[in-house]
Regions:
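Conserved core architecture of multi-subunit DNA-directed RNA polymerases
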Residues: 1-234
Length: 234
């Protein structure tokens, strides 16, 4: 049998890494996980459980409830869990720490005047053109070090408090713990324009997305269950 498809060659110019928003996680998911139960008494996946058949199947005799395909044809589908309370994403703790110390605790603005912001953006642009993205990242770190020393907001004039981090994920403001709920609320106040000063593209990542309210659940095919000695699946 002849294959008449002509191969297409394209060059990848760039890759953009982003953080999934809660809205995106929900949109790409096929099921909401609401119960810790995995299988019913007959051994079939429980709807709304981590082995929900809408996330794909690992048993040869079953069909996926999302695409209708069997094990070999179904790639699997994501689900999601709505968290009862926001949770800090461990991989972004250092970024969150910098953002909290560099923005106003009241209005959320970056702690430098508007004219200085424009100057910073011009400098970052020139550094990237002349020296590359790595030098741009170093310049951003330099800007953040300067912001940490400012104790009064140039916009709302509120006094800033000292913020410290008790590893791995506990933030303190004047020795008082800041909850993930409050941290997320503060990060929501940061404007898209201010995000760019920190090297964040607001179209790909918003600061508040680093504090999880929705957790993506991988397809069943990525995490097959095992059978215990008792005959139960886990």
């Amino acid at each position: 049998m002849e294959n008449n498809d002509t191969p297409v060659f394209k060059k990848v110019e760039s890759i953009i890494f982003s953080v999934l928003s809660p809205k995106t996680v929900k949109k790409m998911a096929s099921a909401k996980i609401v119960t810790p139960e995995l299988y019913d008494k007959e051994g079939y996946p429980v709807d709304g459980g981590l082995m929900d058949a809408r996330l794909g199947v690992i048993d040869p005799g079953l069909k996926c409830k999302t695409c209708g395909a069997k094990l070999k044809e179904c790639p699997g589908h994501f689900g999601y869990i709505s968290l009862a309370r926001p949770v800090m994403h461990i991989k972004f703790i250092s970024v969150i720490y910098d953002l909290l110390r560099s923005t106003c605790r009241e209005c959320g603005r970056i702690l430098i005047p508007k004219k200085e912001i424009e100057k910073c953006m011009d400098e970052l642009k020139n550094v990237e053109i002349e020296c590359g993205p790595e030098e741009r990242r170093l310049k951003i770190k330099e800007i953040i070090r300067t912001l940490k020393t400012i104790n009064k907001c140039p916009y709302c004039k509120s006094r800033q408090q000292k913020i410290t981090l008790e590893k791995p994920t506990t933030f303190l403001e004047n020795e008082k713990r800041i909850s993930p709920i409050e941290i997320r609320t503060r990060l929501e106040k940061i404007t898209d324009d201010d995000c760019k000063v920190f090297g964040l593209d607001p179209n790909s990542v918003r600061p508040e997305w680093m504090v999880l309210t929705i957790m993506a659940i991988p397809p069943v095919t990525m995490r097959p269950s095992i059978t215990l000695e008792s005959g139960e699946r886990s």
